[in-house]
């Protein structure tokens, strides 16, 4: 059911992306900037924005610019993240910097970042609410950068605690889903308690989503549209790895950059055998349950129920 709702709302998002984010001159820059947008994706963040607007009893079309702005920010972060991580694949296509070069990819990300705020400013809402929304999205972008820096700095350290990992994930992934869920409450001038509850729904959903994403990196071989096992090879301190290290597990391929499939499979088996994978799954589920509890402040409706189902979907998807 929820997958059909996601597809339906994503269709609206894609149509608006076509309208607002056209290719233009200089062609080389905009081809790079639109590369991931054209590659598709589930559009989960803008779908959450539209469903949140509906759950608040508002016309979702009045939140469409905010939804596109958030998807544009998301794509800007992907372009820059892929440069830093040196990933070659994303969404089943070559990464922007691989195709267009690093200088153009940096400019493409910067362009998307600026376009996001331009699009948000077009929202059909009172000017003072738009200003608040712009301010909140700007703060989210700062926190995303902080989270990305934390993630990179963890790679240089021998050990990272679970609480540090969760704070990094809250910033790198959680806050963008937090603003996705709460920005309609800002634009429509809803009560602060409603805005806060939707923010928390998004934050907790985002943490659960990221933990599940880390799980997919070692279990979603051939499905996730990026390099399988790349987190291990890059030396990323995911919750799974943190737990495995606590259990005294040694991973031969961790942070090595390259390894044979056989070596990688041996290390991944260790993560399953020591209980680290099951532990991460349990933690992801806990965060999703916390997310859903925050929706209780909103009157029951089909759209609220869709948000509940979507939270479950975030940790049940296979890609």
From Swiss-Prot:
The record lists Mg(2+) 1 as bound by 81, 85
Q: Name the residues that bind isopentenyl diphosphate.
A: 42, 45, 74, 91
Subunit structure comment from the entry? Homodimer.
> Which protein family is named in the record?
Belongs to the FPP/GGPP synthase family.
Protein name in UniProt: Geranylgeranyl pyrophosphate synthase
Q: Which organism is it from?
A: Geoglobus acetivorans
| Its job | Catalyzes the addition of 3 molecules of isopentenyl diphosphate (IPP) onto dimethylallyl diphosphate (DMAPP) to form geranylgeranyl pyrophosphate (GGPP). Catalyzes the synthesis of geranylgeranyl pyrophosphate as a major product and of farnesyl pyrophosphate in smaller amounts.
Q: Where does Mg(2+) 2 bind?
A: 81, 85
Gene Ontology terms for molecular function: (2E,6E)-farnesyl diphosphate synthase activity; dimethylallyltranstransferase activity; geranylgeranyl diphosphate synthase activity; metal ion binding
The catalysed reaction is:
isopentenyl diphosphate + dimethylallyl diphosphate = (2E)-geranyl diphosphate + diphosphate; isopentenyl diphosphate + (2E)-geranyl diphosphate = (2E,6E)-farnesyl diphosphate + diphosphate; isopentenyl diphosphate + (2E,6E)-farnesyl diphosphate = (2E,6E,10E)-geranylgeranyl diphosphate + diphosphate
Its pathway? Isoprenoid biosynthesis; geranyl diphosphate biosynthesis; geranyl diphosphate from dimethylallyl diphosphate and isopentenyl diphosphate: step 1/1; Isoprenoid biosynthesis; farnesyl diphosphate biosynthesis; farnesyl diphosphate from geranyl diphosphate and isopentenyl diphosphate: step 1/1; Isoprenoid biosynthesis; geranylgeranyl diphosphate biosynthesis; geranylgeranyl diphosphate from farnesyl diphosphate and isopentenyl diphosphate: step 1/1
């Amino acid at each position: 059911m929820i997958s059909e709702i996601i597809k339906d709302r994503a269709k609206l998002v894609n149509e608006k992306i076509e309208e607002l984010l056209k290719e233009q001159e200089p062609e080389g820059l905009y081809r790079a900037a639109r590369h991931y947008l054209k590659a598709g994706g589930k559009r989960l963040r803008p779908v959450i924005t539209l469903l949140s607007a509906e759950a608040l009893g508002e016309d979702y079309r009045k939140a469409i610019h905010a939804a596109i702005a958030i998807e544009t920010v998301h794509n800007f972060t992907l372009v820059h993240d892929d440069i830093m991580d040196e990933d070659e694949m994303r969404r089943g296509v070559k990464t922007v910097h691989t195709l267009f070069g690093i200088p153009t990819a940096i400019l493409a990300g910067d362009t998307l970042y600026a376009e996001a705020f331009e699009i948000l400013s077009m929202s059909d809402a009172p000017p003072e609410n738009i200003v608040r929304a712009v301010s909140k999205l700007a703060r989210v972008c700062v926190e995303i950068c902080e989270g990305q820096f934390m993630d990179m700095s963890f790679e240089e350290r021998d050990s990272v605690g679970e609480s540090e990992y969760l704070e990094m994930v809250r910033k790198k992934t959680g806050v963008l889903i937090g603003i996705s869920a709460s920005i309609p409450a800002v634009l429509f001038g809803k009560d602060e308690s409603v805005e806060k509850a939707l923010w928390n729904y998004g934050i907790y959903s985002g943490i659960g989503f990221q933990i599940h994403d880390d799980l997919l990196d070692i279990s979603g071989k051939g499905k996730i549209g990026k390099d399988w096992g790349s987190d291990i090879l890059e030396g990323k301190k995911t919750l799974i790895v943190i737990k495995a290290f606590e259990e005294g597990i040694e991973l031969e391929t961790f942070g090595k950059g390259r390894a044979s499939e056989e070596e990688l499979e041996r290390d991944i088996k260790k993560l399953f055998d020591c209980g680290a994978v099951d532990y991460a799954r349990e933690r992801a589920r806990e965060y999703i349950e916390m997310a859903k509890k925050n929706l209780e402040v909103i009157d029951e409706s089909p759209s609220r129920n869709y948000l509940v189902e979507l939270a479950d979907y975030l940790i049940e998807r296979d890609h």
